[in-house]
């Protein structure tokens, strides 16, 4: 930053400024106008004259270019001394002009006379580029056109003037602050720039700018205060830009103003310049308004957006505050202007709409800039004034709507100038930034169309637009804006599908420049750069426009106008930009314009060498047509242009292309483009001019590959729309490999001629600075323009840019470049982009064959390649459904992401291959899908979620995609490489792919907004999930396959994860799979399901059971009817304690087998009966629950048992008792799950689990039996340690507080094995109930169920045996016999019930009245005898009588006694110790106690016939109950119990249907099932299991 600031401080020589002014933007524009059939034609001659003058100065500036290039490389502002000197003058002039309208008028005149207003000095150009290649130096537009435009829209000119003044004030403020800003020169004042250049080139004058303000003021469009406010805002914006933060507002305002001024310089130095200044003012005002609007979509709140911009720009310098103020000031005037201009633009809306209709015909509708205004006046608005007015109005509206950078405002001013030269071009410019500012582009375009904005030609707007796009704060907004802008562009005729493409077209239209002539400024080289709209205005680019072009890529978001402002350095950078080298990760900001525009530049003017051809009339026409409906008519093929950009750049560029559609991407592109510009400036100063060889959007599309998404957009619309005109003699500029920094890494980009070998027939008003070398064909007619549009020529070896983009792409891409790559993917790959260069203009309908790589999570499944149809730039062209671009990379954060190479994943190649690997249509279900179609472990499912893979990750997690895309854009430009870049690509491509919803998506992916996104998302927002997911992103796209594929192996245990990001995977409800949650040491197989859910088994089972309970409750009021195809309803109806599987499936909808994308999208379900579907769901639930169980075991073993700190607090015996054989249990479970998953993968539609359970039954017995048997010691040891070992307590507390435990205690982990084996039996029982009677599957299920049932019985017996033995030993120590003694301890004896009762005795009295006496008696009921004892001190008992169980009987007592004596029952001993009969009367405290004793004393009952118990009440357990006495029944949630008796005090006795166990339990734990049909169904299922078991026993016997 310091170096950049220093450079900013050093203003480049005025000669450089002159060089900019020399750039014949006006002639170009005039030619453009002529192509449009507007008055611009009349200006062609003056423009040519001016061009030659500019060439003369360019010759001088050539030296300055070197200096500028150097400055640009260092990213310093290029305020040249002359410009610096001029700045004060300009400031003074502006101040005067602002002070009084008279002074403004006088000044404009004087300035016009002397052409004091010069093109934005190189410093301006450099500054915009440096600050964030926010804007491309505006191209000077033909004065004549501007004059005409001014005449059409004096209000616009006044607005422009106001903007210029605001910029002047901004410049002054920036100068006062002593901060040199890239935009300071540009934004400080277009007037200041004009003065500098006016002194040298005499092309632009402040006076000119002032009159427009005056006009505006007089017309009510702009008030003096507003003008001042605009100026201040412009200054502030300039400050922000100077700070090096790519402020969209500042860049847009300052750069646009300056660019417009430059354009005016290029145009007539006199009145035209004044008009341009006016237009610029209007533009600036609009820009400010737009910026304000961007800040608040409809509130015109510049404050928020400005604050964000300030924060972003604050990174560079203190300019942000000024920028914000200026934005705020501009808002009001701009709003007023917007109102007035909107009215004007409305007049043109009809024409624009016409054009839009045309564009829509070509599929450009999606991204067409609202050209309603333009279409209405397509012929007339081509003058540029109308376009500017309409563009402004719309851009403001769009800004307000999108909260995005004030791209529309920028675009509007720029569009006006462009409209002067090339209303379409400027319009395109507007649209380009419009990936973010598409809606703005729409606004601007109409504005540009309606008012004669030729004065607006000054490429101020590009900067502003770029800045606005670049602003980080509006990534989300930008995305929306991008889509809207793209749409508006389509309407306008720009390649709306890819706003960048439109920009490219306009840029490509820039007239070919001679090597001497300054290379098309970034705007020219990259008119489509996010600086975008300003990119065209930078007609005054220095001869070194190549450097600008180079920058343009970097400043992708910052239109070339930023690059253009610095004739020397920027011009050099232009080639890089043109080449689509958003080489630096910073390029993301420019995606809107830069992505496509840059690529085309690379192929057109950007390409060095003779191939750089002047933009042919076709290009101009194309640009114009782009601006109008014609442009969108032919969707350029992103593939064609994507090849132009180096791979690395392409990756970023592509992303940027898409980014162009998204403001966030633009901002990211800006940053990247800045870096790339700094590197590219030097090597590609002359060559970069050539990238504009194809002025068409195709050219831009060619360059858009730099952005990644732009290729797709441009290729879709621009390429098709623009047919390469016969290349005029290509003027090969010195081809210098452009060095672009991608992700902060400098990359050498070899400037190459654009794919369109034809020299740009004419420089679009915005992007053409170099003198037009050949007659610029006039393409007023959209069809004509299209015809004139040069088709991208087949990639020539000379196209270094193309090779370079690949080279860069191949180079280790910084995280930032990754983002752009997704755009390139729409083609086939970065390489394929080269192949597509020569694509002839095709109907927009056809999108690139290969969809761009989907953004990570953010994008969500819409990005997946499966869908196959991506509409790049909103084009309907279908991409191969098989494309790999459907990469569901955005996986949940926990998922493993693509290998670090993933940073390049955004690259078209990487994304393509990844998408292919990831995208298996069947992999939608994260876990199960993975099973079906496991992807290579190297294919991370969560590239997006896993930020580590690249910086883009931040953008994604942001996210996100997430709306991943917006988050990606928000991420730094570097992040944009993978995140933003992808998101742009995802936007462009997803729309295409969205044609079919990704199979990956599972119903459990609520977060996946991208999944199955319709092709209509072509606006580039397809990424918005998102993206994301992944983010997105829930299981977003992580399918079953993915978890299994994850290298971590255990991280993704199940399907949902696969789709979680963008890919398919959410079949299982489980949430994101965590890579580390793999089965601890088990390496045999990477579990696909183990980490599919974030829930541990404890929580998972609770959730499932709770849902089961809820479904049962709902069924109470419903009759059991076969539900629809959905298995849930049937389950609900069949809910029973045994149907754990049903409950589990119902509990987690995401874990449903039917939700696996492969299953859901297949026809198998149609041929399956409802019962068969339920059976599969039950079996699948067994697998899913086992994965969750294993995850919990891994924590128990790895986190607790293997903890060294915990082990230090325990003795060996304590450690053995506490953990027993837990590790063995874990290993068996891991093997079991592995076999289950393998079985499932072998046949997902009819997989088996019972045979696997049966095969593992011996292993279960080997580990579960000893572990469960040790449970008693385990509990005691744990309790003892907690009570006596403080160290253990402290360490355990610390371990349990770890997030991995999810607030669960160690005890809950230790009891899991027994719980699991019990529930596993219940799951098998549910499977058995749904099998066909007599089938082999029923036999296997019965065997497996019986084996587990026997295991559980043995476990229970072992546990009880130990406990009973201990209890007998304890009692033997407490009991004494006063009667016959007998041995109490016996292995066959256990205590059934014990308690103290009150014995009632009647004593005989002399009066024959019996007296009732009471005494306490303690009963100990064993399974074989009963002891009666008297309690003693010390909990001791004295036995006075006992009897065998067979000789005792209890019964209710019907005796009515007076007093409190209730709850009585009789005990009869037929034979006591003495061999006599005895009778006792006992009283209990409660009725339940009485009933429980009577029940315990009763003889064992025969087993009930369940089919005869239909009238018996049933209850379902709501809360688990742990028995406190031996006669109580342990309950688990969802258990169904048939009630046999109940007491008045809230206790029930019943038989559990699942296993026939009997016992008592409190009524508070259960809920009665009132529906008789449900009760009958529960009984029927229980009977079915019982019958099958009996048959098996008989067979075995």
Curated annotation (Swiss-Prot):
PROSITE patterns: DH_1, DH_2, PH_DOMAIN, SH3. SUPFAM superfamilies: DBL homology domain (DH-domain), PH domain-like, SH3-domain. It holds the Pfam family PH. Its main location: cytoplasm. The modification Phosphoserine is found at residues 184, 445, 450, 983, 1011, 1044, 1126. CDD domains: PH_ephexin, RhoGEF, SH3_ARHGEF5_19. Ubiquitously expressed with highest levels in placenta. High levels are also found in colon, kidney, trachea, prostate, liver, pancreas, pituitary gland, thyroid gland and mammary gland. In fetal tissues, expressed at high levels in kidney, lung and liver. Expressed at low levels in lung and heart. GO terms for biological process: actin cytoskeleton organization; hematopoietic stem cell homeostasis; intracellular signal transduction; myeloid dendritic cell chemotaxis; positive regulation of DNA-binding transcription factor activity; positive regulation of JUN kinase activity; positive regulation of podosome assembly; positive regulation of protein import. Residues 299-309 have a biased composition (Acidic residues). The modification Asymmetric dimethylarginine is found at residue 866. Residues 192-204, 428-438, 583-601, 655-682, 926-941 have a biased composition (Polar residues). GO terms for molecular function: GTP binding; guanyl-nucleotide exchange factor activity; lipid binding. It is found in: Cytoplasm; Nucleus; Cell projection, Podosome. GO terms for cellular component: anchoring junction; cell periphery; cell projection; cytoplasm; cytosol; nucleoplasm; nucleus; plasma membrane. Residues 217-237, 901-920 have a biased composition (Low complexity). The keyword Phosphoprotein applies. Residues 1174-1358 form the DH domain. The keyword Glycoprotein does not apply. Residues 1510-1571 form the SH3 domain. It comes from the Eukaryota. Residues 266-278, 323-368, 394-404, 474-490, 731-746, 950-969, 990-1012, 1057-1072 have a biased composition (Basic and acidic residues). Interacts with SRC. Forms a ternary complex with SRC and the PI3K 85 kDa subunit. Interacts with and is activated by the heterodimer formed by GNB1 and GNG2. Interacts with ODAM (via C-terminus). Interacts with RHOA. PANTHER family: DH DOMAIN-CONTAINING PROTEIN-RELATED (PTHR12845:SF2), GUANINE NUCLEOTIDE EXCHANGE FACTOR (PTHR12845). Guanine nucleotide exchange factor which activates Rho GTPases. Strongly activates RHOA. Also strongly activates RHOB, weakly activates RHOC and RHOG and shows no effect on RHOD, RHOV, RHOQ or RAC1. Involved in regulation of cell shape and actin cytoskeletal organization. Plays a role in actin organization by generating a loss of actin stress fibers and the formation of membrane ruffles and filopodia. Required for SRC-induced podosome formation. Involved in positive regulation of immature dendritic cell migration. The PH domain binds to phosphoinositides and is essential for podosome formation. This is Rho guanine nucleotide exchange factor 5. The lineage of its organism: Eukaryota, Metazoa, Chordata, Craniata, Vertebrata. The gene is ARHGEF5.
């Amino acid at each position: 930053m310091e170096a950049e600031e220093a450079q900013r401080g050093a203003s480049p020589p005025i000669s450089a400024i002159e060089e900019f002014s020399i750039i014949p933007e006006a002639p170009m524009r005039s030619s453009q106008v002529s192509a449009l059939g507007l008055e611009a034609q009349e200006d062609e001659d003056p423009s040519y004259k001016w061009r030659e003058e500019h060439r003369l100065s360019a010759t001088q500036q050539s030296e300055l270019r070197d200096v500028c290039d150097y400055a640009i490389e260092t990213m310093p502002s290029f305020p040249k001394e002359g410009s610096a000197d001029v700045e004060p003058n300009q400031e003074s002039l502006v101040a005067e002009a602002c002070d009084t309208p008279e002074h403004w008028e006088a000044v404009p005149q004087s300035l016009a006379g002397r052409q004091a207003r010069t093109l934005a000095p190189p410093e301006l150009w450099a500054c915009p580029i440096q600050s964030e290649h926010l804007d491309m130096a505006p191209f000077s537009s033909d004065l004549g056109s501007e004059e005409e435009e001014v005449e059409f829209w004096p209000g616009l000119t006044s607005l422009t003037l106001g903007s210029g003044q605001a910029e002047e004030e901004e410049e002054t403020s920036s100068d006062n602050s002593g901060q040199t800003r890239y935009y300071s020169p540009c934004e400080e004042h277009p007037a200041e720039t004009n003065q500098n250049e006016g002194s040298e080139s005499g092309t632009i004058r402040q006076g000119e700018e002032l009159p427009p303000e005056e006009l505006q003021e007089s017309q009510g469009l702009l008030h003096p205060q507003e003008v001042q406010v605009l100026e201040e805002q412009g200054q502030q914006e300039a400050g922000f830009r100077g700070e090096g933060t790519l402020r969209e507002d500042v860049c847009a305002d300052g750069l646009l103003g300056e660019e417009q001024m430059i354009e005016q310089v290029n145009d007539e130095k006199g009145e035209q310049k004044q008009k341009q200044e006016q237009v610029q003012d209007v533009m600036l005002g609009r820009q400010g308004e737009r910026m304000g609007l961007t800040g608040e979509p409809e509130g015109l709140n510049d404050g928020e957006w400005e604050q964000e911009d300030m924060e972003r720009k604050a990174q560079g310098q203190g300019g942000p505050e000024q920028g914000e103020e200026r934005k705020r000031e501009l808002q009001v005037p701009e709003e007023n202007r917007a109102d007035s201009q909107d009215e004007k633009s409305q007049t043109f809306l009809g024409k624009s709409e016409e054009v839009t209709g045309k564009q829509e015909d070509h599929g450009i509708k999606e991204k067409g800039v609202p050209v309603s205004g333009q279409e209405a006046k397509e012929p007339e608005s081509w003058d540029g004034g109308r376009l500017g007015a309409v563009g402004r109005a719309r851009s403001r509206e769009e800004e307000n709507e999108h909260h995005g950078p004030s791209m529309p405002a920028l675009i509007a001013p720029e569009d006006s100038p462009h409209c002067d030269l090339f209303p379409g071009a400027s319009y395109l410019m507007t649209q380009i930034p419009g990936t973010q500012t598409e809606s703005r582009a729409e606004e601007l375009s109409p504005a540009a169309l309606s008012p004669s904005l030729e004065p607006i030609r000054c490429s101020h707007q590009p900067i502003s637009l770029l800045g606005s796009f670049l602003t980080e704060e509006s990534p989300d907004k930008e995305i929306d804006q991008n889509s809207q802008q793209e749409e508006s562009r389509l309407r306008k005729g720009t390649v709306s599908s890819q706003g960048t493409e439109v920009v490219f077209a306009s840029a490509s239209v820039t007239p070919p420049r001679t090597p001497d002539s300054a290379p098309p400024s970034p705007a020219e080289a990259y008119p489509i750069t996010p600086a975008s709209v300003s990119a065209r205005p930078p007609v005054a680019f220095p001869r070194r426009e190549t450097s600008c072009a180079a920058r343009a890529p970097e400043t992708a978001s910052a239109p070339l106008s930023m690059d253009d402002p610095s004739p020397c350095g920027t011009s050099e950078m232009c080639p890089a930009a043109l080449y689509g080298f958003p080489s630096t990760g910073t390029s993301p900001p420019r995606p809107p314009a830069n992505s496509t525009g840059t690529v085309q530049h690379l192929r057109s003017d950007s390409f060095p060498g003779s191939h750089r051809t002047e933009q042919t009339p076709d290009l101009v026409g194309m640009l114009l047509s782009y601006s109008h409906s014609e442009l969108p008519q032919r969707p350029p093929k992103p593939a064609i242009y994507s090849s132009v950009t180096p791979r690395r750049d392409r990756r970023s560029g592509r992303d940027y292309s898409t980014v162009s559609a998204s403001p966030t991407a633009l901002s990211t592109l800006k940053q990247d483009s800045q870096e790339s510009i700094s590197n590219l400036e030097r090597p590609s100063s002359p060559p970069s001019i050539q990238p504009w060889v194809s002025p068409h959007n195709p050219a831009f599309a060619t360059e858009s590959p730099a952005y990644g998404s732009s290729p797709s957009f441009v290729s879709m619309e621009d390429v098709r729309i623009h047919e390469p005109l016969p290349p005029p003699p290509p003027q090969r500029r010195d081809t210098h490999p452009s060095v672009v920094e991608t992700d902060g890494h400098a990359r050498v980009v070899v400037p190459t001629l654009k794919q369109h070998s034809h020299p740009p027939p004419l420089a679009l008003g915005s992007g053409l600075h170099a003198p037009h070398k050949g007659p610029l064909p006039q393409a007023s007619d959209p069809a004509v323009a299209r015809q004139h549009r040069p088709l991208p020529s087949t990639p020539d070896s000379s196209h270094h840019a193309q090779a370079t983009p690949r080279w860069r792409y191949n180079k280790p891409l910084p995280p930032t470049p990754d983002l752009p790559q997704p755009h390139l993917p729409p083609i086939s790959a970065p390489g394929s982009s080269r192949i597509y260069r020569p694509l002839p203009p095709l109907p927009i309908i056809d999108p690139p064959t290969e969809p761009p790589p989907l953004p990570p999570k953010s994008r969500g499944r819409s990005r997946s390649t499966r869908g196959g149809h991506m509409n790049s730039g909103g084009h309907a062209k279908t991409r191969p459904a098989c494309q790999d671009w459907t990469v569901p990379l955005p996986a949940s954060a926990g998922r493993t992401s693509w290998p670090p190479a993933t940073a390049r994943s955004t690259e078209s190649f990487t994304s393509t291959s990844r998408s292919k690997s990831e995208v298996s249509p069947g992999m939608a279900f994260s876990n199960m899908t993975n099973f079906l179609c496991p992807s290579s472990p190297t294919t991370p499912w969560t590239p997006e979620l896993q930020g580590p893979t690249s910086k883009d990750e931040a953008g994604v997690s942001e996210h996100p995609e997430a709306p991943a895309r917006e988050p990606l854009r928000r991420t730094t430009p570097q992040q944009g490489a993978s995140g933003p870049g992808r998101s742009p690509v995802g936007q462009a491509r997803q729309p295409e792919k969205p044609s079919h919803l990704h199979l990956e998506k599972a119903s459990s992916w609520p977060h996946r907004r991208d999944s199955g996104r319709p092709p209509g998302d072509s606006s580039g927002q397809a990424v918005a999930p998102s993206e994301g997911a992944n983010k997105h992103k829930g299981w977003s796209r992580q399918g079953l396959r993915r978890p299994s594929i994850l290298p971590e192996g255990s991280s993704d245990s199940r399907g949902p994860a696969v789709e979680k990001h963008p890919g398919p995977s959410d079949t299982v409800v489980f949430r994101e799979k965590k890579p580390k949650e793999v089965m601890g040491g088990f390496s045999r197989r990477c579990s696909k399901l183990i980490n599919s859910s974030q829930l541990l088994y404890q929580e998972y089972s609770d959730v499932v059971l709770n849902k089961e309970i809820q479904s049962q409750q709902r069924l109470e009021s419903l009759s059991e009817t076969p539900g629809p195809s959905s298995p849930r309803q049937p389950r609900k109806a069949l809910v029973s304690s045994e149907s754990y599987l049903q409950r589990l499936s119902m509990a987690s909808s995401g874990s449903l087998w039917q939700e696996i994308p492969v299953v859901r999208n297949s026809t198998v379900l149609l041929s399956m009966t409802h019962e068969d579907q339920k059976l599969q769901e039950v079996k699948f639930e067994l697998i899913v629950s086992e994965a969750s169980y294993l995850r919990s075991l891994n924590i128990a073993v790895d986190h607790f048992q293997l903890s060294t700190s915990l082990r230090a607090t325990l003795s060996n015996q304590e450690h053995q008792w506490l953990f027993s054989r837990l590790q063995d249990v874990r290993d068996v479970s891991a093997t079991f799950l592995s076999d289950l998953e393998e079985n499932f993968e072998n046949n997902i539609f009819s997989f088996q689990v019972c045979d696997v359970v049966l095969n593992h039954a011996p292993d279960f017995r080997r580990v579960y039996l000893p572990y469960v048997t040790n449970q008693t010691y385990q509990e005691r040891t744990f309790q003892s340690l907690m009570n006596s070992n403080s160290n253990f307590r402290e360490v355990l507390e610390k371990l349990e507080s770890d997030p991995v435990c999810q607030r669960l205690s160690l005890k809950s982990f230790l009891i899991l094995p027994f719980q699991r084996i019990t529930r596993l039996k219940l799951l098998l029982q549910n499977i058995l109930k749904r099998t066909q009677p007599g089938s082999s599957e029923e036999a296997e299920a019965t065997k497996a169920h019986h084996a587990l049932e026997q295991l559980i019985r043995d476990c229970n017996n072992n546990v009880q045996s130990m406990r009973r033995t201990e209890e007998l030993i304890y009692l033997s120590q407490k009991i004494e016999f006063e009667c016959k003694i007998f041995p109490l301890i016996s292995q066959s004896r256990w205590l059934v019930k014990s308690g103290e009762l009150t014995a009632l005795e009647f004593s005989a009295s002399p009066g024959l009245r019996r007296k009732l006496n009471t005494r306490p008696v303690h009963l100990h009921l064993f399974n074989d005898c009963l002891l009666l004892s008297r309690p003693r001190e010390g909990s001791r008992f004295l036995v006075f009588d006992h009897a065998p169980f067979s000789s005792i009987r209890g019964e209710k007592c019907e005796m009515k006694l007076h007093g409190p004596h209730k709850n009585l029952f009789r005990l009869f001993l037929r034979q006591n110790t003495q061999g006599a009969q005895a009778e006792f009367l006992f009283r209990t405290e409660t009725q339940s106690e009485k009933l429980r004793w009577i029940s315990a004393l009763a003889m064992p009952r025969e087993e009930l016939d369940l089919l005869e118990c239909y009238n018996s009440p049933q209850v379902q357990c709501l809360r688990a109950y742990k028995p406190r006495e031996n006669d109580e029944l342990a309950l688990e949630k969802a258990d169904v119990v048939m009630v046999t008796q109940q007491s008045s005090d809230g206790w029930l006795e019943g038989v559990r249907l699942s296993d026939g166990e009997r016992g008592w339990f409190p009524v508070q734990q259960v809920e009665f099932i009132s529906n008789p049909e449900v009760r009958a169904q529960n009984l029927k299922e229980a009977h079915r299991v019982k019958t099958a078991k009996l048959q098996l026993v008989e067979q075995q016997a």
